[in-house]
Every structure is written in C-alpha cells, then in structure tokens.
Amino acid sequence: SVMEQRDKILEEYYAQMGIAKPVYDFCMKVEEELKDRFLSIDKTAECNQMKVLRAMQKNHLSEACFAPTTGYGYNDIGRETLEKIYADVFGTEDALVRPQITCGTHALALALMSQLRPGDELLSPVGKPYDTLEEVIGIRPSNGSLAEYGISYRQVDLLPDGEFDWDGIEKALNEKTKLVTIQRSKGYASRPT
C-alpha cells in the first residue's frame, strides 16, 4: 500500500541520517501511544482555525482591508475589521489590536489608566504584582505612574497556603477602591500560581 511504502521510505531516510533501528522503532511506538493526544490537539487546532475563518467571513475580510492608509488612523478599514475579527474569535465586546501595544505590561497599563482616575484606589488581593507593573502602579517611583496621577494602591498578600485572605480583602476594600486586579501569574515570586 501507499502508506506502507511511505513508512518504509521514512525508515530508510532515518537510517541514512544515522538513526538506529531500535531508536526509530521506539519513536514509532511512542507516537502510536500518543496518537489520541495528537488527534485531540489537531481537533482543537481545527476548531480554532474554523472559528477564525468564520469570523473573517462574518466581518467581510477582503483585499481592501490590506490597502495602505493615510497614517493618521482615520477610516482604517483593515484595522477596524481585524479588531472585529478578534472580538468575535475571543467572544468579547470589543478588541484593540495594534502594533503599538508591544507587550502584556503595556496592555495592562492601558487598561488600568483607562479605568482609574485621581482619588481612586487599585487593590491587588494576590500580593505584589509582576515586577514590570511596579513602575506602572508607582510601587517603584516612575514618571507617568498611577501614583503620580493620584491613584493609590493597596495590596493584600495571599495566605501561606496560597489562598485568598478574605478577611484582609474585606478590610482593604473602601470607598476609594475602584478596581481589583487579580494576577494569576506569580512572576518571579515564590508563591503558587
């Protein structure tokens, strides 16, 4: 059969590359054992690909979306369409997809600065934020930080077992608390994720 010929050719190619027959056979055995996992991953990828393709069709992605713009950001049909596609794919109300948003810290800074105003307070009930957010918040002094704009910060550390300190959180909440940030990633801290 065609598949048997393909397998024989593959085995020969591996042998020519110096892969010993026992190693090759072991790899084939492991691949066979993982076949169901690989199939599951492939199905997830296929589902996600279809989700993206459906969103592209729904939002009428076309060659016009790839045309150059004036550079001022007005009437950029490509950007507007791309953001609608992202919102549909991720099931969100809206999306910002810009090359100017360079990293996760940048995205979080934009979110915090868009929601907090002078006199407001940001609460972190999971302890200290990721290192790069310290300057954004103003834990470490920085020009343009939330603290510089009169936004205070309070944190409640997790309990030694990694659970929320519910009593501490209740005490920390006050009339100034406008936003609570829960960071799952531990960053460089030794706490559990």
Task: List where the protein language model places each region.
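Conserved PLP-enzyme active-site core in the AAT-like
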Residues: 5-26, 52-53, 65, 74, ...
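Short, Lys/Arg-enriched N-terminal segments with co-localized hydrophobic residues
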Residues: 1-2
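Glycine-rich phosphate-binding segment of PLP-dependent enzymes
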Residues: 28-92
